[in-house]
Regions:
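Hydrophobic, Leu/Ile/Phe/Ala-enriched alpha-helical segments that form helix-helix packing faces
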Residues: 83-95, 162-170, 269-280, 416-420, ...
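A structural signal for well-ordered alpha-helical scaffolds and beta->alpha junctions
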Residues: 80, 84, 156-160, 230, ...
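Conserved protein-kinase catalytic-loop segment immediately C-terminal to the catalytic Asp
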Residues: 357-361
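ATP-binding pocket architecture of kinase catalytic cores
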Residues: 103-350
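Short loop/turn segments that connect beta-strands within the blades of beta-propeller domains
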Residues: 114, 362-363
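Intrinsically disordered, low-complexity intracellular terminal segments
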Residues: 195-224, 243-247, 252-255, 283-356, ...
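Juxta-kinase regulatory segment immediately upstream of eukaryotic protein kinase catalytic domains
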Residues: 2-108
Length: 518
């Protein structure tokens, strides 16, 4: 098993540019001067009243989530003084006076990703911003917190552990500094760089002892008992400004055909992937931070974004937080059972990597990797070339688009072969050989589906079935075979069809409410 970024995180969830307070805020989600007729934005696309019902994703949940996010945003804003006090305590910043003060920027300039709300905090001296920090809170309604209390803390513990692991084992990967973090119960931790000299020395000695004795990795974070409680988990991160780099997605369209820039990008991504996979892992799962002794251990379930999305949509939990795997078969078996349960519990069931998390300079040299959530120790077979290299998502990779991606895939793996000569791997796994074999055998499509919410619908027909049969009647054959999926299949399908009808009725009701509120 090797450490991998399992799935996409929050697109644009950190601040690349800070607008002046007089600038126009981010555009609203329910209106656009370029659209006509009733509708709304969903994941950057305009949906009409009619097309919303044809979406594979659950639009009812999306509307409810947006409303809940607005309430959570206001809840955080009402606690802005506490947020400023927490930042001040963790970083030992001076108290506000006539010249210095700490300001939480108004909500219209905050950034919301798929799973987090990012609050920008600015230190002002003489009316000018001198320091900027990102106070990031997980969204309770996106992390199944009401169904499974403690999931937000689980996410923070795993994300913090990813920072600690990379700080220790991959110092060549530039990531934002994690200054501090806190949990739901009010326990908070601060990086030892903010501690007095004597405590820093003592911590260094303890970490050395842990290494010598083979104990779990001791982090560089100490408990902080002076910071006020917020009432929600959080992480306090370094603000990464344009002087470090800009999101690759900002210049992607402009330079996508520049061979030299792409070569530098491929080299950079290869270095990151090889650095993360340099050390073999003992099991399939996630590292997690242990508040009792501030160590990290590989003792959490594989926390994939797909898992959280399904659990948040009322799919029963299949893998418990403390469950890890020693072999691929048992992990795969539980994941397939999880997909079965998702189908049974999704009322709308009868119907990935991201270039925004990479910061680059003008020449596309990678300068920083952001959003370390969803990093897992997964089977090496799941390692794959990023599907977005040709500006297409996995379900779009057919015909000429597939041929184009295959060409870029080969170029990417050639770049990785070159980088392998410069990376000291502590195992004898032939990474690029496995990645090439996964493509040839078409296993790559299967593993892509395992990490996805709904790619099964597209990739099976386009890529997996043709490996076994090309005859036109295979779809009918599969329908007949599906009757032995489990007992009472006909009744299950009829029930799902009734649920779909009720879903469409409720969706139209919600959409009318949305239009009336515009």
């Amino acid at each position: 098993m090797d450490l991998q970024i399992s799935s996409k995180g929050d697109e644009g969830s950190d601040f690349r540019h800070i607008p002046s307070l007089s600038a126009d805020p981010a555009p609203k989600t329910l209106s656009s001067p370029t659209t006509t007729g009733p509708g709304f934005f969903h994941h950057g696309r305009w949906l009409s009243m009619a097309s919303a019902g044809e979406e594979e994703s659950n639009i009812i949940l999306a509307i409810r989530f947006r409303r809940t996010a607005e309430k959570f945003r206001q809840w955080l804003w009402d606690r802005r003084d506490n947020i400023a006090a927490v930042v001040r305590s963790h970083l030992h910043l001076p108290k506000d006076d006539g010249n210095y003060f700490l300001e939480v920027i108004p909500t219209e300039y905050w950034r919301q990703g798929g799973f987090n709300m990012c609050v920008l905090v600015v230190a002002m001296v003489g009316g000018r911003a001198t320091s900027r920090f990102v106070f990031r809170c997980p969204l309770p309604h996106k992390l199944a917190e009401s169904q499974y209390p403690g999931t937000m803390d689980e996410k923070i513990r795993c994300e913090v552990a990813s920072y600690v692991w990379i700080q220790e084992h991959c110092p060549d990967i530039r990531i934002p500094a994690l200054y501090a973090f806190g949990f739901s119960d009010g326990t908070q931790f601060t990086h030892t760089s903010q501690a007095p000299f004597s405590l820093r020395v003592a911590r260094r000695v303890r970490r050395w002892v842990h290494r010598i004795l083979g104990r779990p990795l001791l982090s560089n974070y100490n408990r902080n008992t002076s910071a006020p409680a917020i009432g929600t988990p959080y992480v306090l991160l370094e603000f990464i400004g344009p002087e470090v780099g800009n999101m690759l997605s900002m210049t992607w369209e402009q330079h996508i055909n520049d061979a030299e820039r792409r070569a530098r990008l491929y080299e950079g991504i290869s270095r990151i992937m090889l650095s993360l996979t340099r050390l073999p892992q003992t099991r399939i799962g996630c590292y997690r931070f242990n508040p009792n002794d501030t160590t990290i251990t590989l003792a959490n379930r594989p926390l994939l974004s797909t898992t959280i999305i399904f659990e948040n949509a009322n799919t029963p939990r299949t893998i418990q937080p403390s469950e890890t795997y020693h072999n691929t078969d048992s992990f795969l078996s539980d994941m397939l059972s999880f997909f079965d349960d998702q189908f049974l519990h999704d009322p709308h069931a009868v119907r990935s990597e991201n270039d925004a998390n990479i910061l680059v300079d003008d020449d596309w040299n990678i300068t920083c990797l952001i959003d370390l959530e969803w990093i897992c120790a997964l089977p090496i077979e799941m390692l794959e070339v990023p599907s977005w290299l040709t500006n297409r998502s996995p379900e779009q990779l057919t015909g000429e688009h597939l041929d184009l991606f295959d060409n870029e895939r080969q170029v990417f793996l050639s770049a990785m072969d070159k980088e392998l000569k410069n990376v000291q791997q502590e195992h004898d796994i032939q990474i690029t050989s496995i990645m090439r074999d996964s493509w040839t055998s078409k296993r790559v499509w299967f593993w892509t589906c395992i990490q996805s919410v709904n790619l099964w619908l597209f990739l099976i027909e386009d890529h997996i079935l043709p490996k076994f049969s090309y005859h036109d009647g295979i779809d009918d054959d599969l329908k007949r075979v599906s009757t032995v999926w489990r007992e009472g299949v006909r009744q299950i399908v009829e029930a799902k069809q009734r649920e779909e009808t009720e879903y469409q009725k409720e969706l139209q009701h919600l959409l009318k409410e949305e239009m009336a509120a515009k």
